[in-house]
Amino acid sequence: MKKLTLLMPVIFAISSLIAQEKQGTAASSAQEIADKLSNPVANLISLPLQSNVDYGIGAHNGARYTLNVQPVIPVHLSPNWNLIARVVLPVIDQRDVTGEGNHEFGLSDATVTGFFAPSNSRNGFMWGFGPAFLVPTGTNDFLTTKKWGIGPSALVIKQVSGLTFGFLVNQLWSFAGDENRSDVNQMFLQPFFAKNFKSGAGLGVNAEITSNWIAHTTLATLNPIVTAVTRIGGQTISMAVGPRIPLSGPDELRAKLGLRGVLIFVFPK
């Protein structure tokens, strides 16, 4: 609870920055916004709220709800370069995952990534690179590594005629934290594909692959989604929904089935 209280000023600061950026900006077309949301290094402020529900986890058929708060804030460095700051802060509520009758709720560890990316694409190609950080914000012993981590992150994408495809990858190693906890040596890989239409509707699919090099395990999930961009009042939003299909992973970590819903508050320039 103490860590959650400390994070509230950060959340309010992000909200204030977004509100200031929103003022005086012109509306963009629905497809243009959808294409930018498909691009992890687009020059676009957004606040995605990603909800995941996973069922049938482990020996006790546990269930987990994860809300990923994922603010994206671009910073203009020069006429040729931007820095795209991306945060993933998970809030988790799970039952019967760590043991029958067990219940855990709270923050999990945050991942903070900074992508240095060219301001303009070349023939539809864009790329980005930068550091990724693991921050032990977890408020429950079962939801945190209690480790600080750092490593490289990179992505490559191609966009043309409403199509977006590419991949994002990062590797994290722990360098400090609780000595009684296992070290972190983990890679995350996310290939993705999206097709957006003039109406702002779209279809997409990505795979989320997490490899733990110390435990020699790989957890992979396929996420097909249907998306839409619309406006409610003066606020531009994007919505997405789809199943989460487990592909591989150890029995104690892999779910049998899941669902994903995403609500993104968009602040076009």
Question: Model regions: which residues?
Answer:
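Cleavable N-terminal export/targeting peptides
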Residues: 1-30, 269
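Transmembrane beta-barrel domains of Gram-negative outer membranes and organellar outer membranes
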Residues: 21-269
